[in-house]
A protein has these predicted regions:
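Structured domain cores in non-transmembrane regions
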Residues: 53-124
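Short N-terminal segments immediately surrounding and downstream of signal-peptide cleavage
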Residues: 23-40
Length: 191
C-alpha cells in the first residue's frame, strides 16, 4: 500500500509544474470606474511571449489576444444571473517592410518599433467600456455589489489552420490567465 501511495504522489508532483505553467498571464489591479459613456475597466496584465510565439509573430503570424469580462449577480434560488458579458480582441502583427509591430483593436491601430513596446501596451488595458451609460437595461445599478470576472487569453482559434493543429496540446501556444474574480460595488455614474 505505501508503494502505491508513493507512486500516486510522484505522479501528482509531475503534474503540478505543468499546471503552474498553464496560466502564464497574471492579472493585477482590476478596477471598474464610472465614465461619461458608462462603466469602464482598467487592468494590468503581466506576461511574456515564449520563444515560439515571438518567432511566429516575427515571421508574420498574427496573434489574437482576447480579453473577456463578465458581471453576475448572485441568486439564492438559482444559478447566478449573468448581467454583462463582453470580449475585446487585440491583433498583434509584425510588418517586415516597415520593421514595426502593430497592435490593433477594432478600427484602432498603433505601431511600435519593438515587440516589448507592443506587449507593454497590450498589458495595460484602460478605458474599456463594459457597461453602456444606460446601465439599467443591463440590470445593474450604482451602489449595488456584483461579482466581476476578467481574463485574457491567446485565441488559437483565430490562428491560421496549420498553427491551430500544431497548437492543440502544445503548452507553447497555451497563453492564458485564470479568471480573476472580485466583488465590485458600482460607483455613481459620472455626469
Amino acid at each position: 500500500m505505501p508503494e502505491r501511495l508513493r507512486g500516486w504522489l510522484l505522479a501528482l508532483l509531475a503534474i503540478v509544474p505543468a499546471l503552474v505553467l498553464a496560466a502564464e498571464i497574471e492579472i493585477a489591479n482590476p478596477q471598474i470606474t464610472a465614465s461619461e459613456d458608462g462603466y469602464v475597466v482598467a487592468v494590468d496584465f503581466s506576461f511574456e511571449l515564449n520563444e515560439r510565439l515571438e518567432e511566429a509573430v516575427t515571421k508574420g503570424v498574427v496573434l489574437y489576444f482576447v480579453a473577456d469580462f463578465e458581471m453576475t449577480r448572485p441568486r439564492w434560488y438559482w444559478f447566478d444571473e449573468k448581467l454583462v458579458s463582453r470580449s475585446q480582441t487585440y491583433r498583434l502583427s509584425y510588418h517586415a517592410l516597415t520593421r514595426q509591430y502593430r497592435l490593433s483593436t477594432g478600427g484602432l491601430h498603433q505601431s511600435f518599433d519593438s515587440l516589448s513596446d507592443a506587449l507593454r501596451m497590450l498589458s495595460r488595458l484602460r478605458n474599456w467600456l463594459v457597461i453602456d451609460k444606460d446601465a439599467e437595461k443591463a440590470g445593474v445599478r450604482p451602489g449595488e455589489t456584483y461579482t466581476a470576472a476578467l481574463r485574457m487569453r491567446l485565441d488559437i482559434n483565430q490562428l491560421p489552420r496549420p498553427f491551430q493543429i500544431a497548437a492543440l496540446g502544445n503548452k507553447d501556444w497555451n497563453l492564458t490567465s485564470d479568471w480573476k474574480i472580485w466583488q465590485v460595488t458600482l460607483p455613481a455614474e459620472a455626469k
